[in-house]
Amino acid sequence: MPFPTIPPIAGVEIATGRAGFYKHEREDLLLMRFAEGTSAAGVFTRHGVGSAPVDWCKRQLAATGGADVRALVVNAGCANSFTGKPGADAVRRVATAVGKRFDCRQRDVMMASTGVIGVILDDSKITARLPEVESRLKADAWAEAGRAIMTTDTFPKGAYATAVIDGHEVKIAGIAKGSGMIAPDMATMLAFVATDAAIAPAALQTLVSLYTRTTFNCVTVDGDRSTNDTLLLFATGQSGAPKIHRAGDKRLADFREKLEGVLLDLALQLVKDGEGATKFVKITVNGAESPASARKIARTIAESPLVKTAFAGEDANWGRIVMAVGRADEPVAREKISVKFGDLYAARDGLISAEYDEAKMSAYVKNQAFEVSVDVGVGRGSATVWTCDLTKQYVAINGDYRS
């Protein structure tokens, strides 16, 4: 999938380098420097074994209110999760080193890590490369940044849009990584978005929390939630547009729409790059008791190994979908349930459809991308989740991950 053309974002400088967290030669370190006065907001994993960098970011954003964040450091190859005090100390030392170089407080430095869980971060690999990486900071290195944070990803993921705030054009750009262990709750894998708009931290936090629910929280690859899920949004205020203090400000209408679009673009790229994936599937549930109920049913379908292996085998096995609907433990009206593949009814009013055509169903699911919709017949709640299939290649990738 081609990486989009992303122009410089005023107030953002980017550089990458090789810290040596991988046995083979590749760039695995990302450094971003932000202009003074940059606002930041984030959402993070609610995993019970959150990583040291997640703890650090949450603590610093709470302490500063997201005001004047100056830097972001990201490493790939070591998650620094389940590493106790040594892992936390490693993050602090990196933040201190970056703070000294950028003449800012350590609390103004955000950090994220991805890779193998249980290995303590060797922070000396990062601090030793800081002078070299800092010397290469430039405004147009978004593609390099996307590649540096990859783990099992097969392509770098980026998105870009422009919006208008009170007559001023502003830019929004982002990168993300993730291919497996994707079933986010409050965030997803790693994603970093920057804008040159001027938005107060509290408003920025409201926006990122709101649109995470409709984007990153609606995708799944394998049902496993990561220990390191992090989404950070930075606003440099360098566009010349007036500063916005409320998320509901009418002047933000276009920006809100474009921000949600960038986040959804990144989230869907994660699914399309799901480990071993050959299918991209949109699952919509209608007629549920509430949107939350619909979302739970849709996620249960999307994460069912039996459903996902049927997708891989290009088998329109609608019985497995009905099984997953019932397993969600949400209110449904059995005698009203319908299942469609695209426009083709597999089941209707609780029975196999009179229009059911096995040949047409089989032909439809041979497409690389297709849609499944379910109506559970109890209310007006609806939700959409995007997923992929589960293939032998997924097993091979994860079986060989450390070896």
From Swiss-Prot:
EC number(s) reported in the record: 2.3.1.35, 2.3.1.1
Keywords: Acyltransferase, Amino-acid biosynthesis, Arginine biosynthesis, Autocatalytic cleavage, Cytoplasm, Multifunctional enzyme, Transferase
One Gene Ontology cellular component: cytoplasm
Localization of this protein: Cytoplasm
Biological process (GO), any one: ornithine biosynthetic process
Major localization class: cytoplasm
InterPro entries membership: Arg_biosynth_ArgJ, ArgJ-like_dom_sf, ArgJ_beta_C
Residues binding substrate: T151, K177, T188, E275, N398, S403
Site note Involved in the stabilization of negative charge on the oxyanion by the formation of the oxyanion hole, residues: T114, G115
First-tier enzyme category under EC: transferase
Site (Cleavage): A187, T188
SUPFAM superfamilies: DmpA/ArgJ-like
Active-site residues per Swiss-Prot or TrEMBL entry: T188
Reactions it catalyzes: N(2)-acetyl-L-ornithine + L-glutamate = N-acetyl-L-glutamate + L-ornithine; L-glutamate + acetyl-CoA = N-acetyl-L-glutamate + CoA + H(+)
Gene Ontology MF annotations: glutamate N-acetyltransferase activity; L-glutamate N-acetyltransferase activity
Pathway it works in: Amino-acid biosynthesis; L-arginine biosynthesis; L-ornithine and N-acetyl-L-glutamate from L-glutamate and N(2)-acetyl-L-ornithine (cyclic): step 1/1; Amino-acid biosynthesis; L-arginine biosynthesis; N(2)-acetyl-L-ornithine from L-glutamate: step 1/4
Pfam families: ArgJ
Family: Belongs to the ArgJ family.
Function: Catalyzes two activities which are involved in the cyclic version of arginine biosynthesis: the synthesis of N-acetylglutamate from glutamate and acetyl-CoA as the acetyl donor, and of ornithine by transacetylation between N(2)-acetylornithine and glutamate.
Subunit details: Heterotetramer of two alpha and two beta chains.
Protein name in the entry: Arginine biosynthesis bifunctional protein ArgJ
Organism: Caulobacter vibrioides (strain ATCC 19089 / CIP 103742 / CB 15) (Caulobacter crescentus)
